[in-house]
């Protein structure tokens, strides 16, 4: 079994991604052909469930873009279900400390290395027990990315990085800026300093740093600092802003009173 996304991170090859929030397999397939290295299927803030994640995984599968799935929480039951439908790479939100990071890793591993429940006869991941020795191969194919998005998590970054089985650490700029007192302003100098320091620290520890940033200059800055998986846009934002721009060219008035950024 292979995980191309995990292999790319291990090799130090930067991966450029797009966030999927439309919760739709048709749009997921459309974007899978756009040329991004990875696509994030968001189960935290988008209206996804196990069934909609499954159909998006199926839609993306024929394309080179690699799927990354974010559950709504660091919950072993939810993680088990997502792995069984075929997710191999998970982005676990709001991880605050090393214990929570260890719990995330354990949820992705079969015993004795972890606590993932065995149900491979029912699972797309094992191709319904058609993958020989799946139970012994699956653990090494899992890629665990944890999200740090508060000052508390930042203060615990060193111990999180020491957890075996963590492949990457994703900095959540929206929640981090809010926690630091700069809600809606992830480009504030204090937030940017925290992000840049974290990227350097994560890479120095031999892990892959990641982030979502639609500002092209900042995204390139993070890549220069060593970020290895960077999402550079969100499908809902691309659709909304693109539609508004087209309407505006024909005289429509935009109502952007609630717009506060890409995410």
Swiss-Prot record:
Catalytic activity: 4-hydroxy-2-oxoheptanedioate = succinate semialdehyde + pyruvate
Protein name, per record: 4-hydroxy-2-oxo-heptane-1,7-dioate aldolase
GO cellular component, one term: cytoplasm
Site residues (Transition state stabilizer), renumbered to this chain: 70
GO terms, molecular function: 4-hydroxy-2-ketopimelate aldolase activity; metal ion binding
Cofactor binding annotation: Binds 1 divalent metal cation per subunit.
PANTHER family documented for this protein: 2-KETO-3-DEOXY-L-RHAMNONATE ALDOLASE, PHOSPHOENOLPYRUVATE CARBOXYLASE FAMILY PROTEIN
Gene transcribed to yield this protein: hpcH
Organism listed in the record: Salmonella paratyphi A (strain AKU_12601)
Tree of life domain: Bacteria
């Amino acid at each position: 079994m292979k995980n191309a996304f995990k292999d790319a991170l291990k090799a130090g090859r930067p991966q450029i991604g797009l966030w999927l929030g439309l919760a739709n397999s048709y749009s997921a397939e459309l974007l899978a052909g756009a040329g991004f290295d990875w696509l994030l299927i968001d189960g935290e803030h988008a209206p996804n469930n196990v069934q909609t994640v499954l159909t998006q995984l199926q839609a993306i599968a024929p394309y080179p873009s690699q799927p990354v799935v974010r559950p709504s929480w660091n919950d072993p039951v939810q993680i088990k279900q997502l792995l069984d439908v075929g997710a191999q790479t998970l982005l676990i939100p709001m991880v605050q400390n090393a214990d929570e990071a260890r719990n995330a890793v354990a949820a992705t591993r079969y015993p004795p290395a972890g606590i993932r429940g065995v149900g491979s006869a029912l699972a797309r991941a094992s191709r319904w027990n058609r993958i020989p020795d799946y139970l012994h191969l699956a653990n090494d194919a899992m890629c665990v990315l944890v999200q740090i998005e508060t000052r508390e998590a930042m203060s615990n970054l060193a111990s999180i990085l020491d957890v075996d089985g963590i492949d990457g650490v994703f900095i959540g700029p929206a929640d981090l800026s809010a926690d630091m007192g700069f809600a809606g302003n992830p480009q504030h100098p204090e937030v940017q300093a925290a992000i840049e320091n974290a990227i350097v620290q994560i890479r120095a520890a031999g892990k892959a740093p990641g982030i979502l940033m639609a500002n092209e200059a900042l995204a390139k800055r993070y890549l220069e600092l060593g970020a290895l998986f960077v999402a550079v846009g969100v499908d809902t934002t691309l659709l909304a802003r693109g539609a508004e721009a087209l309407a505006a060219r024909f005289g429509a008035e935009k109502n952007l009173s609630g717009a506060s950024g890409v995410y």
